[in-house]
Each structure stands twice: as C-alpha cells, then as structure tokens.
Design a protein with these regions (language model features):
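Mid-domain alpha/beta scaffold segments of enzyme catalytic cores
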Residues: 1-226
Length: 226
C-alpha cells in the first residue's frame, strides 16, 4: 500500500459524508480560526489553531483584546486532533503594526513550546524578522513557514537553523530543490481550489522525482512529527 498524501496546510475540511475513500489515502492539517468548532472524528484529519496576523488589527485600539483568545487556544491544544499551533507570524502588508504582531506571535510561540506542538507560520515580507526571532527564543518545537515563495538563499538560511518550508501552488523552484535535499520540505494546498494531488505532481515535475517517492518521504517526516 502506498503512502498517503500529506496536505500540511489547508483551509478546506474534507467532507466525510461524501469522500469516504479520500481518508484512506490522504492526511490533512486543516487550519482553523480560534473560534471554530473542531470535529475530532474525521479520519486522518488534524488541525492547527492560532491567531492569524490578519486578525491582529483589532489589537491596535484594544491591546489586550486577545488575552482571552490565547487562553481559549491553550485550553483546546491538548486535543489529540490539534497537531499544530498557528498559523501565526508576521505580515508587513496586513494586520496590526509589527510590535503588536510580534507580541501575539510570541504568545503563540510560548503555547507551542508549552504544549509541545509544532508552529505553522505565516510570513509576508518579514523573513529576516522571523529568523531573528527564532534565533532569540531557541524553540524546541518545529517551525514551518507555509506557502514559501522566496529565493533559495533565504531558504538555506532558514533551514540551516532548523526551520521547515511548506510549498503550495506557487513557489521558487530552486528553493524547493534546497528544501527537498535538506529534508525540510512539506506540501500544501492552503486556500486554493487545486487538489493536493496536483501540488504533488507539480513538485514531482520540479524535482524530477516520482510522486510516490515524495509521498513516502513526507509520510516518514510526518510520522516523526507526531
């Protein structure tokens, strides 16, 4: 039996009532808002919960508006179906100012460390700041930057410090090659309508590696992660 497809970051919850065969061949990490209801009974479906940088804007006028949210996330994290914290991080184009984003990012880093859950990171035009924060806090839990599109030189710097990169429908081919060779690569659909099969096929074409080989490698990584 071949390894399942791992969709490391998606915003779409598979429909268990319709796609029953899907769950035999796919594993998904679905990103949920901190207020969403979690269904722990969908096979091979895990979740990440956190405060997205885009959601931080309310803290501009009410600095403590997320205190209760952080506590609510903390209460949910012991659920076995919640695999990761996030997506959290920095966005230079949307959300509150960088100081507020940093404060909330740090709060979620602490949750990740305390609850022993990997951290999924949203990062737009703030890779240097993300790397500097990583070096300053020395996390023990894996960090995964999702939707990575930047250049290979930046990718190498991030991976040298232990950060994973997840690639979706748009990516830098040289960066994907670097991540594959470094065993730091994940694949995702994010919010797109493309299937994870299409993403794997695109990665296969880029890497000149069979889809089944990619599936086996990422599944091995996944079993180590959980």
């Amino acid at each position: 039996m071949s390894a399942p497809y791992i969709n490391f970051h998606t915003h779409h919850i598979p429909d268990f009532s319709v796609e029953t065969d899907y769950f035999d061949t796919h594993i998904s990490i679905v990103n949920l808002d901190y207020s969403d209801v979690i269904n722990p009974n969908i096979p091979n479906t895990y979740y990440s919960i956190g405060i997205h940088p885009w959601s931080t804007v309310c803290a501009t006028d009410a600095p403590n508006c997320f205190d209760e949210v952080i506590e609510e996330i903390r209460k949910k994290l012991p659920m076995k179906s919640i695999l990761c914290v996030g997506e959290s991080g920095f966005d230079a184009l949307r959300g509150a100012n960088s100081d507020i984003q940093r404060k909330l990012f740090l709060s979620q880093i602490r949750l990740s460390e305390k609850m022993h859950k990997p951290l999924i990171i949203h990062c737009v035009k703030m890779l240097s700041e993300t790397l500097e924060l990583y070096k300053s806090v020395h996390p023990t839990q894996p960090w995964i930057i999702h939707g990575y599109r930047n250049k290979a030189e930046q990718a190498k710097q991030l991976m040298q410090h232990g950060i994973y990169l997840s690639f979706g429908t748009k990516f830098n081919e040289a960066s994907m090659h670097e991540a594959w060779e470094a065993n730091k690569m994940w694949l995702e659909t994010d919010a797109s309508e493309r299937t994870i099969e299409e993403v794997y096929q695109t990665a296969s074409d880029c890497l000149q590696v069979p889809v089944e080989t990619i599936k086996e490698k990422l599944y091995q990584q996944f079993t180590q992660l959980i």
